Amino acid sequence: MFGLGGQELVLILLIVLLLFGAQKLPELAKGLGKGIKEFKKAQNEIEEEFNKATDDSSSKEKKETKA
């Protein structure tokens, strides 16, 4: 995962804990999870639009070559 080992992840978590406090961590994790979910949703929508566009253009080319 991004070239980080276990020790690096623990260190990052400790720093986050010190900066934000234990009470804010669940709220931060929830916000991060929502952000990742929205990012993946947008990524999937872009991929679907790209696939539709490439499928449409390839089907038009096939129709033109048949005519």
UniProtKB/Swiss-Prot annotation:
Gene3D superfamilies: 1.20.5.3310. It comes from the Bacteria. GO terms for biological process: protein transport by the Tat complex. Signal peptide: none annotated. NCBIfam families: PRK14861.1 (NF011430), tatAE (TIGR01411). PANTHER family: SEC-INDEPENDENT PROTEIN TRANSLOCASE PROTEIN TATA. Belongs to the TatA/E family. This is Sec-independent protein translocase protein TatA. It comes from Chlorobaculum tepidum (strain ATCC 49652 / DSM 12025 / NBRC 103806 / TLS). The lineage of its organism: Bacteria, Pseudomonadati, Chlorobiota, Chlorobiia, Chlorobiales.
